[in-house]
Amino acid sequence: MSMKRFLFLTNYPSPYRVRFFDELGKDSDVTVLFYDPLEAITHRNAAWFENSNGGFRGIQLKQTLAVREESLCLDVVKYLKKDYDAIVISGYSSPTAVLAMLYLRLRRIPFYMEVDGGLIRQERKIKYWLKKRLVTLAPRWLGTGKFTTDYLVHYGAKRENVETYHFSSLCREDILAEIVPMGEKQALRKALGIGEEKKVLAIGQFIPRKGFDVLLHAAKGLEKNVGTYIVGGEATPEYLRLRQELGLTNVHFLGFQKKDALAKYYKASVLFVLPTREDIWGLVINEAMAYGLGVITTDRCVAGLELVEDGVNGYIVPVEDVSALETAMAKALAGDTQAMGAASLEKIRPYTIETMAQDHGQLLGR
């Protein structure tokens, strides 16, 4: 039996997508078109990218012009003329994706629109109408769970034509077999030079959307034996100033960490916090749970809404609510963080690159 042939159109080769395409390519013939040139991805450290194992055919499209910093690649059309068992367009807002969908509609070639996540917002009617027009260009959709399905349906997708998959950046081997014992956590904290008895971890860029200003205000009310460590590149002057104004001697900013070093910070922690103002998914939630950590995040984080069960493996708090975040952190730290971590591990086990590839293979190969 011949392999199924799949074509994907996406922005750039992020590490988890490279791993996913490699895994999917073990049982199918996968071609991936990238429309954003790597030199334009300035918000990512060069060490963040990974090379493919050769499991798929990657093609960098040629940028014809940039539309509001988005790439328009007219050469995408020539690749859409070839025969595939399934075509998947990731997202719907880039000029290249819109061009591809319009061409496929015109030629009556079936395809899927894939959306990693989405949050329904209050917005002007014209913006809602435009999004609806774009979403409904597709005849079928792929999403990451209930909340993404609700998002797509809000913009006109037919619920019965939305399929879901386990979204992840992790391979099966990346998920711990069991939670890290407290004795090992203490030894790691000592080795890392962490003086506080309890360590809270946050990871993300120092940008307003991540909500680290909210975390700093919440950390002010925590006990002094709790250290909050934020990993995400160089802290901006605004965050340095806020830390000083609040007198937060137990809040620490760490630069970019490679995978092995970051693993030690995860394992040394007892709680993970993502106080985001908005994340259409938030893969860092998957990663924290894979290290056996309870998670606190906001009601504007789709990964949290899908994966965190309030009071079981973490808490969901209202966005930008300092008091609620402080209360949730204090409650989690005073409780059984190991039990929360164990619940996170069990919840996250199906969310792997291998399962994600298996889901796609089954859905696209019908």
Each model region followed by its residue ranges:
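A short, histidine- and acid-enriched strand-loop-helix "catalytic/donor-clamping" loop
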Residues: 95, 109-127, 137-140, 144, ...
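A conserved mid-protein helix/loop that constitutes part of the nucleotide-sugar donor-binding site
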Residues: 19, 198-221, 238
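Short alpha-helical donor nucleotide-sugar binding micro-motif in glycosyltransferases
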Residues: 256-257, 264-269
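Aromatic "clamp/platform" in nucleotide-sugar-dependent glycosyltransferases that forms part
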Residues: 277
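Conserved acidic donor-binding segment of nucleotide-sugar-dependent glycosyltransferases
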Residues: 309-311, 315-322, 330-336
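Donor nucleotide-sugar binding/catalytic pocket of nucleotide-sugar-dependent glycosyltransferases
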Residues: 136-186, 194
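Nucleotide-activated donor-binding/catalytic signature segment of Leloir-type glycosyltransferases, i.e.
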Residues: 239-257
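Short hydrophobic beta-strand element within catalytic cores of glycosyltransferases
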Residues: 294-298
